[in-house]
Curated annotation (Swiss-Prot):
GO terms for biological process: photosynthetic electron transport in photosystem I. [4Fe-4S] cluster 1 binds at residues 11, 14, 17, 58. Keywords: 4Fe-4S, Chloroplast, Electron transport, Iron, Iron-sulfur, Membrane, Metal-binding, Oxidoreductase, Photosynthesis, Photosystem I, Plastid, Repeat, Thylakoid, Transport. It comes from Rhodomonas salina. Apoprotein for the two 4Fe-4S centers FA and FB of photosystem I (PSI); essential for photochemical activity. FB is the terminal electron acceptor of PSI, donating electrons to ferredoxin. The C-terminus interacts with PsaA/B/D and helps assemble the protein into the PSI complex. Required for binding of PsaD and PsaE to PSI. PSI is a plastocyanin/cytochrome c6-ferredoxin oxidoreductase, converting photonic excitation into a charge separation, which transfers an electron from the donor P700 chlorophyll pair to the spectroscopically characterized acceptors A0, A1, FX, FA and FB in turn. This is Photosystem I iron-sulfur center. It holds the Pfam family Fer4_7. One of its GO terms (cellular component) is photosystem I. Residues 2-31, 39-68 form the 4Fe-4S ferredoxin-type domain. [4Fe-4S] cluster 2 binds at residues 21, 48, 51, 54.
Amino acid sequence: MSHSVKVYDTCIGCTQCVRACPCDVLEMVSWDGCKAGQIASAPRTEDCIGCKRCETACPTDFLSVRVYLGGETTRSMGLAY
């Protein structure tokens, strides 16, 4: 099953999602758009198992990382990888 992992520009660079992912789908990359100077990126979405631990770990009010399973669709906001 194909999963889509999207990282939005509300990411605060805390690394919680990266540490929560059991499949190393996420990594931090440099980005000047937030105080932390980094943002989560999802370069290995093919390894995503859809557990949504990254979503659970995200401390922002608007989840900065979202996993869309199979047929779920959304209009992308911010940065999508």
